[in-house]
Swiss-Prot record:
Function text: NDH shuttles electrons from NAD(P)H:plastoquinone, via FMN and iron-sulfur (Fe-S) centers, to quinones in the photosynthetic chain and possibly in a chloroplast respiratory chain. The immediate electron acceptor for the enzyme in this species is believed to be plastoquinone. Couples the redox reaction to proton translocation, and thus conserves the redox energy in a proton gradient.
Gene behind the chain: ndhG
Protein's UniProt name: NAD(P)H-quinone oxidoreductase subunit 6, chloroplastic
Family: Belongs to the complex I subunit 6 family.
One GO cellular component, as annotated: chloroplast thylakoid membrane
Length: 181
C-alpha cells in the first residue's frame, strides 16, 4: 500500500464517488444498451478503486474479476445475442470513436513503456517459506481462502453448481430461440 495523506485520500474518495454517480446515471439514462453496459463496467472499476482506498486488496481484485470480468462481459454477450441487424450498421467513424482509438493507443504505449522500464529484480520484504508457515493466518486473503476451503466449502460448491445450471439454462434458451427463428 502506498502511504497517502488524509487529504489526498479524501480527494480520491470524492472523485471516485462522483465518477460512480455519473456512471450510474449514464447506465440508467442512456438509450443504447451497449453504452449502459460499458458504463456499468466503469462503475464496477470505480468501486474496485474504492476498495483499494480502504486497503481491501482482495475485495478490489474480486470486484474486477467477478463483476467487470464476468458479469459485465455476460451483459455484453447477452446484448450481442439479442441485438437486431438494424443495430449493426457500417457507418463512418465518429469523432468519439477516433478519440477513443487514440486514447487506447496512447494508454497501450504508456503501459508498454512502463512494463519495459520497470526494474523487476527488486524484491521488497519477501519472506521465506518458513517465515510464511510460522505466521498465523492474519491477512485478509489467507483468512478468506481458509474459510472458503474449510467451513464454507459445501455452500461454495453449491453456488458453483447453481451457476452451472444457470449457464446451461441460458444456452438452452438461446439455442431454442435460434431454432424457432
Amino acid at each position: 500500500m502506498i502511504p497517502i495523506s488524509e487529504s489526498t485520500n479524501t480527494l480520491l474518495f470524492v472523485v471516485l464517488e462522483f465518477a460512480i454517480l455519473v456512471g450510474a446515471l449514464g447506465v440508467v439514462l442512456l438509450s443504447r444498451v451497449i453504452y449502459s453496459a460499458l458504463l456499468l463496467g466503469f462503475v464496477f472499476i470505480c468501486v474496485a478503486l474504492l476498495y483499494l482506498l480502504l486497503n481491501a486488496d482482495f475485495l478490489a481484485a474480486a470486484q474486477v474479476l467477478i463483476y467487470v470480468g464476468a458479469v459485465n462481459v455476460l451483459i455484453v454477450f447477452a446484448i450481442m445475442l439479442v441485438s437486431t441487424p438494424d443495430d449493426v450498421k457500417n457507418k463512418p467513424k465518429t469523432t468519439g470513436e477516433i478519440i477513443s482509438a487514440f486514447t487506447f493507443i496512447a494508454l497501450f504505449v504508456l503501459l508498454t513503456i512502463m512494463i519495459f522500464t520497470t526494474s523487476w529484480d527488486t524484491h521488497h520484504n519477501l519472506a521465506t517459506q518458513d517465515e510464511v508457515l510460522l505466521q498465523p493466518l492474519m491477512s485478509n486473503v489467507q483468512t478468506i481462502g481458509f474459510h472458503l476451503l474449510t467451513d464454507l466449502l459445501f455452500p461454495f460448491e453449491l453456488l458453483s453448481l447453481l451457476l452451472l445450471v444457470a449457464l446451461v439454462g441460458a444456452i438452452t434458451i438461446a439455442s431454442k430461440n435460434k431454432i424457432t427463428e
